[in-house]
Each structure stands twice: as C-alpha cells, then as structure tokens.
C-alpha cells in the first residue's frame, strides 16, 4: 500500500517518493518551510522533523536566567550535594591505601616485566628447594648441564687413564749442523737453521675424519672433517693414537670421529 505525503496528504508513488525525517514526501513537496525552495537529500537540514534550507535553519538561542533567591538556593544545594558525594567517595577509598591510576601502555609494560621477574625468581627458588642443600644435588643447572655434556663426550676417559704406548713412533727431524764457509783467511759465520715439524709418512693404518674435533687435553690432537690421520694405533674401543697428516700433530683421538680408509 502506498503511503500519503506528509505535506499535501496525497498518495505517494514509488517513482516520486522521498523517505526522510521519518515521513514520506513528494519530490515537489519536499521544500523548505520558510522559503519554499525545493530540497534534496544532500542540502536539507531537519528541525523537529521538518525540512529547512541552510539559510533558514532555526538557530538555538540561550536565555538568561536571573539570580533569584530560588535559583541561588538550588545552586547552593547542588554544590552541597556534590561535596557530600565527594566526601563519601573519599571516605570509602580512605582505608584501602591506594589511589586510582590510569592503565597506560607504560604501566602495562612495567606490570608485565614485574610478573616475568617474579616468575623467574619463583622458578629459581623452586629449583633450589627441589635440588636440596647437598653439594652434588644443589649444583646450578648450568654447571650440571656442562658436566653432563663433558661426561657424554668422553665416557671412557673417566674410567681409564690415558697411556701413550711405548711402541708409538716419535718422529723427530734430525738437526743439521751449520757449515761455516771460509774464503781465504776470512771465515763466514753459519746461518741458523730453522727447525720445522714435518708430517710423518703414510705408513701404517690410515683413517679419515668424519667430524670436527677440538683437543680437550694436551695429549690429544685437533682435526677437521676430511683430514687424514696416519700411523693410527688402536688403544681401546673408544680411543686411538695417530698423527694428523695436515698439521703433523700426534696424539690421542676419539675412535667414533674417524673412519678407516
């Protein structure tokens, strides 16, 4: 059913209907109340559900109120009520010992940091109480982890001491005596000979390193992945004795870090 126009009261058909200010209007009836200028949805202004143009839109004016005794009494009463409420709120929060603080991002960050610190301290105290006061069990977790890793890396070193076999060849380069040359009656002093460590020959068993290894003691040798170890002798199931061909160093090496060639 088609509605009636809010101004002329006639039926408004969909082709000329304007729905605005909770009413239905003809396009021609939708005009300013003062100057009768036709309006649309973009330039109208509503006041008390009536359309106005921008020039004739009613402006609100404020009226002055005289300071009569009655108005002064109401003003004083409202001030007293506000003071009473303020004192009530103050008395309620007086015994609580805190003041209301705005929840700013900086305070949230500080609160989060304090929570993390308290959690860390709680876990530290818990670990200390769980480990007990004994020397072995009261050890810090970092020291325990380092000792566990070292004992895992060298399980056989704690059981059997290192013994360098007497049959292991020791390579020494013979030192050449400097020869002095003489020219007539003058004798030229001999130049010093620099002694260099030479890599041993390729005799005996040969192995290839499959991992990098850094020497933990003075009687061990360091090597890299792919290095060749020559003159290898088996000491036990976990350790060998040989010479790194690249560096010429001789000493102990773990058997599970190399493979036979």
Curated annotation (Swiss-Prot):
Q: How is it modified after translation?
A: Phosphorylated.
Tell me which residues make up the SH3 domain: 202-261
Which CDD domains does the UniProt record give? LIM_LASP, SH3_Lasp1_C
What compartments host this protein? Cytoplasm, Cell cortex; Cytoplasm, Cytoskeleton
Specify where it is mainly localized. cytoplasm
Q: Which InterPro entries match?
A: Lasp1_SH3, LIM-SH3_domain_protein, Nebulin_repeat, SH3-like_dom_sf, SH3_domain, Znf_LIM
Occurrences of domain LIM zinc-binding (ranges): 5-56
Q: Which GO terms describe its cellular component?
A: cell cortex; cytoskeleton; focal adhesion
Can you name this protein? LIM and SH3 domain protein 1
The free-text function statement in the UniProt record for this protein reads:
Plays an important role in the regulation of dynamic actin-based, cytoskeletal activities. Agonist-dependent changes in LASP1 phosphorylation may also serve to regulate actin-associated ion transport activities, not only in the parietal cell but also in certain other F-actin-rich secretory epithelial cell types.
SUPFAM superfamilies in the record? Glucocorticoid receptor-like (DNA-binding domain), SH3-domain
Q: Which domain of life is it from?
A: Eukaryota
Q: Where are the Nebulin repeats?
A: 61-95, 97-131
- Native species of this protein? Pongo abelii (Sumatran orangutan)
Residues modified as Phosphoserine are 99, 118, 134, 146
Family annotation (Pfam families): LIM, Nebulin, SH3_9
């Amino acid at each position: 059913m088609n509605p009636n126009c809010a101004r002329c009261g006639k039926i408004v058909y969909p082709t000329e209907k304007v729905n605005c200010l909770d009413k239905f209007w003809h396009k021609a009836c939708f005009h300013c109340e003062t100057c009768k200028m036709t309006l649309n949805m973009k330039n109208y202004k509503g006041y008390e559900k009536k359309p106005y143009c921008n020039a004739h839109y009613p402006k609100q004016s404020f009226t002055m109120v005289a300071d009569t005794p009655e108005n002064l009494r109401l003003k004083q009463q409202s001030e007293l009520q506000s003071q009473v409420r303020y004192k009530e709120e103050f008395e309620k929060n007086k015994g609580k010992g805190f003041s209301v603080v705005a929840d700013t991002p900086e305070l949230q960050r500080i609160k989060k940091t304090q929570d993390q610190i308290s959690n860390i301290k709680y876990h530290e105290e818990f670990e200390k109480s769980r480990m007990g006061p004994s020397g072995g069990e009261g050890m810090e977790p970092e020291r325990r982890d380092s000792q566990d890793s070292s004992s895992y890396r060298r399980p056989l070193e704690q059981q059997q001491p290192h013994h360098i076999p007497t049959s292991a060849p020791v390579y020494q380069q013979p030192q050449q005596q400097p020869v002095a040359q003489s020219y007539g009656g003058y004798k030229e002093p001999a130049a010093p000979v620099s002694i260099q460590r030479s890599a041993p020959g390729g005799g005996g068993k040969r192995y290839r390193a499959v991992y990098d290894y850094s020497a933990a003691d003075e009687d061990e040798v360091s090597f890299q992945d792919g290095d060749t170890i020559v003159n290898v002798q088996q000491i036990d199931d976990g350790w060998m004795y040989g010479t790194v061909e690249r560096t010429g160093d001789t000493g102990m090496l773990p058997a599970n870090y190399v493979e036979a060639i």
